[in-house]
Amino acid sequence: MNYKEKYRQWLDFADPDTKAELESLTDEKEIEDRFYKDLAFGTGGLRGIMGAGSNRMNRYTVGKATLGLANYLKSTGKADLKVAIAYDSRNNSADFAKTAAGIFANCGLHVYLYDRLVPVPVLSFTTRYLHCDAGVMITASHNPKEYNGYKVYDAKGCQLCTADAAAALDYINAVDDYNAIPFCNDHANIHPVGDRELDAFIAAVEQQSLYTQPSDLKIVYTPLHGTGNVPVRRVLRNMHVSVVKSQELPDGNFSTVRSPNPEEKDALTLAIAQAKAEEADLVLGTDPDCDRVGIAVRDGDDYVLFTGNQTGALLVQFVLTMKKAQMNEKSTLVKTIVTSDLGANIGRSFGLQIEETLTGFKYIGDKINTYEQTGDKEFVIGYEESYGYLVGTHARDKDAVVSAMLICQMAAWYKNQGKTLVDALNAVYEEYLSLIHISEPTRRRGIS
């Protein structure tokens, strides 16, 4: 079927709002772009520009993926299947989550749907905590406001790896009739979740706490209009934290930034300006789904932005210093192949085993699952150069909540010694830089 035939097909079955959007299109190239292919379901799930069409994120493409995923889960033959669903602050995220919940419920699955926006690591944790068979997170990470996405997690709270994603894709591709999608607005199989699960997540994060001595460390935090505001402030409640008010509340248009990506200096401009006014020591910024965190550190009258490699290496040293007595021959650090060797060499100096994975945090999560199954190794910390870190096994995805807590505790620990994180990084370079050939490889921009 060519794009024109697909366009006419959609005009026949679409709801009034979708049909009106399609009928308003006058640019043939735009029509072609919306229908020349189906939105691809890859190892990261769905991700695309929102709008009407088979190559866009909308209730129909979400519905197709959900029906296919439901059929895939039912093919296992397991009874009483359960799915956890959460969503971020993006436009249409809550609607897409409700669409998915209704379809899963109509297919006979029990759905545990968050009653509020929450971070990605909360969904990963909840999938495990409620013993679900799968999880779905509606998010497009730090992409521009026009985008949204649909991430799929397995029963362990890990994003689907290659084999499972391929198996699910077969069932999704088999859905070729949008009229067959069992949309449903309400169903007895949909169970709201919220306070209890979020409290359990916070408790799990706080079990990773490493330094709680009083400190006069001053922090400026921005959730960049995303999901981090509540959970990050909860784990930092005993520290001196001020929030960038204009970026505090959820806003799917990300009105104050060009891009809500904490890798980019522009995203932290307002936070750094506030930090200068308040003479804060540390700036934290989490992306909209709060799985990545960027930092800027006061250095004299200016603020220095750290890369993911730098922050990760400092976290490795801090965590291992604080947990040195708990380390054993099984203790393992996991990093991706594009992440610098600085943290790995710090890990080796503490006697840790080092494992490398392909790019994408799901591979780090998969390693944690393997360690639990075999008992051969014990996960201590995992990270990637694109600002994603995990300490603890409460989740199987990168977690900016636990990372923010530990970064602030690390900064407080150093400040109580009369040092900044810049001082700490310089000391790390002096001690470990001679052990590696390349300290800061060029960062490969991408989505994980």
Q: What are these model-predicted stretches?
A:
Residues 84-147, 242-292:
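N-terminal small/polar loop signature for handling phosphorylated ligands or for N-terminal nucleophile
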Residues 168, 387, 396-404, 408-429:
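Mobile "lid/hinge" segments at catalytic clefts and subdomain interfaces of large enzymes
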Residues 14, 30-35, 39, 148-269, ...:
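Gly/Ser/Thr-enriched, mixed-charge loops and adjacent short helices
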Residues 436-447:
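Single conserved hydrophobic/aromatic residue that forms the stacking wall/gate
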Residues 129-157, 165-173, 261-285, 316-319, ...:
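Phosphate/diphosphate-binding loops
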Residues 5-100, 194-216:
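An N-terminal, well-structured beta->alpha segment
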Residues 37-55, 223-231, 383-387, 393-402:
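Conserved phosphate/anionic-ligand binding catalytic regions in large, soluble enzymes, centered on
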Residues 115, 174-196, 299-383, 390:
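Proline/glycine-rich low-complexity loops and linkers
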